[in-house]
Amino acid sequence: MSPSAITESPRNSVVDHTSGLQVDSLAVQGPFPSFHGYDHVTWWVGNAKQAASYYNTLFGMKIIAYRGLETGSRYFASYLVGKEDVRFVFTSPIRSHVHLPEDEPISDEDRALLKEMHAHLEKHGDAVKDVCFEVDNVQGVYERAVQQGAVSIAPPKTLSDKEHGSVTMAVIQTYGDTTHTLLSRDNFRGTFLPGFRDVNRQPAAYSALAPVPLQRIDHCVGNQDWDDMRAACDFYERCLSFHRFWSVDDNQISTDFSALNSIVMASPNNVVKMPINEPAKGKKRSQIEEYVTFNSGAGVQHIALLTSDIITTVEAMRSRGVEFIEVPHTYYDTMRRRLKTEKRDWELQEDFDRLVRNNILIDYDEGGYLLQLFTRPLMDRPTVFIEIIQRNEFDGFGAGNFKSLFEAIEREQAERGNL
């Protein structure tokens, strides 16, 4: 199977409980509530203030909103940072759950969340906790998911404030300790969510740094343990009506030392795409195995951020201190020859030598091309990283670059003693 081929899931009929009709689980529109895209990604971290500053300084984002002691949140602090439609929320506990006074006036809900957050940090370190989808019908998506076996974390509820209106949200469990929030903000006019205060002042030093032209979240990748990929994909198909958009196996994603399998699940209207990876047998430990070991289980491996100008983006990030993986020059020697000899209906718009200098990779078919690059892991645990991606009439996921990318990652694994 071609790595860029769009593949279909087995066709399963489900009952639309609003109409009583049998509907195909791969239908793109029909009765399924629409997914509008990624709303935001929530990270649970040890120090939200420092994490927010890190992404502002290195990735060119800015603090947009805040929730903490000053807004009445007595046990948690959260910072919303973002650029255009990229939104990350960093949340930290600000009290110990084991040293609270016996007469502490804390709700049972906050006590349980405080305990869960500390346990999550001990198990995973700084990590993605939640990937939020904006949908047009929270109740409909939630009910269908739960009816199909999804674990409910929080049923639909409405949050509001007098000034900005209300949002509706619900939470379901996905792979590992990761969750999905389902959010509708049609009736909300504020910057983010009720309970957050807008932040309008930014450190003066940020204005001296090169701007980073990010646009939105392109996709979020989940790593699974051995033989767990298909169960994770089945969850998205069964519970959220996603379909299999794209897939490759270990015959196509392998190096001399390791291999993996990958399936991309997409929402019914294809606006949300969630690649799911698992390790495959190889001579040594794959990057997926390394992730699962240091993350203590399945979780979000990387978040791809879309840009319309990857050269400017990567150069700006590099000047700000972001570390990217290094690609051998032999890759570009081969790519230069291919671009000169292979038939296609497009011309590369970027300066090839600048792509080489910035270690940016190229994948393409006859109709278009993709440019991409991975950062090094963002934490001391070799777990989460960021991908920068630019699409030019190309909907694939860089299968042509997988071998080169993974060989580059393996070189760093070897330095860490984890290959």
From Swiss-Prot:
<dbReference type="InterPro" id="IPR037523">
    <property type="entry name" value="VOC"/>
</dbReference>
<feature type="domain" description="VOC 1">
    <location>
        <begin position="37"/>
        <end position="185"/>
    </location>
</feature>
<keyword id="KW-0223">Dioxygenase</keyword>
<keyword id="KW-0828">Tyrosine catabolism</keyword>
<dbReference type="GO" id="GO:0046872">
    <property type="term" value="F:metal ion binding"/>
</dbReference>
<keyword id="KW-0585">Phenylalanine catabolism</keyword>
<feature type="domain" description="VOC 2">
    <location>
        <begin position="216"/>
        <end position="376"/>
    </location>
</feature>
<dbReference type="InterPro" id="IPR041736">
    <property type="entry name" value="4OHPhenylPyrv_dOase_N"/>
</dbReference>
<dbReference type="InterPro" id="IPR004360">
    <property type="entry name" value="Glyas_Fos-R_dOase_dom"/>
</dbReference>
<comment type="similarity">
    <text>Belongs to the 4HPPD family.</text>
</comment>
<keyword id="KW-0677">Repeat</keyword>
<dbReference type="GO" id="GO:0003868">
    <property type="term" value="F:4-hydroxyphenylpyruvate dioxygenase activity"/>
</dbReference>
<keyword id="KW-0408">Iron</keyword>
<keyword id="KW-0479">Metal-binding</keyword>
<feature type="binding site">
    <location>
        <position position="219"/>
    </location>
    <ligand>
        <name>Fe cation</name>
    </ligand>
</feature>
<feature type="binding site">
    <location>
        <position position="387"/>
    </location>
    <ligand>
        <name>Fe cation</name>
    </ligand>
</feature>
<dbReference type="Pfam" id="PF00903">
    <property type="entry name" value="Glyoxalase"/>
</dbReference>
<dbReference type="GO" id="GO:0006572">
    <property type="term" value="P:tyrosine catabolic process"/>
</dbReference>
<keyword id="KW-0560">Oxidoreductase</keyword>
<dbReference type="GO" id="GO:0006559">
    <property type="term" value="P:L-phenylalanine catabolic process"/>
</dbReference>
<feature type="binding site">
    <location>
        <position position="302"/>
    </location>
    <ligand>
        <name>Fe cation</name>
    </ligand>
</feature>
<dbReference type="InterPro" id="IPR005956">
    <property type="entry name" value="4OHPhenylPyrv_dOase"/>
</dbReference>
<comment type="pathway">
    <text>Amino-acid degradation; L-phenylalanine degradation; acetoacetate and fumarate from L-phenylalanine: step 3/6.</text>
</comment>
<protein>
    <recommendedName>
        <fullName>4-hydroxyphenylpyruvate dioxygenase</fullName>
        <ecNumber>1.13.11.27</ecNumber>
    </recommendedName>
</protein>
<dbReference type="InterPro" id="IPR041735">
    <property type="entry name" value="4OHPhenylPyrv_dOase_C"/>
</dbReference>
<dbReference type="InterPro" id="IPR029068">
    <property type="entry name" value="Glyas_Bleomycin-R_OHBP_Dase"/>
</dbReference>
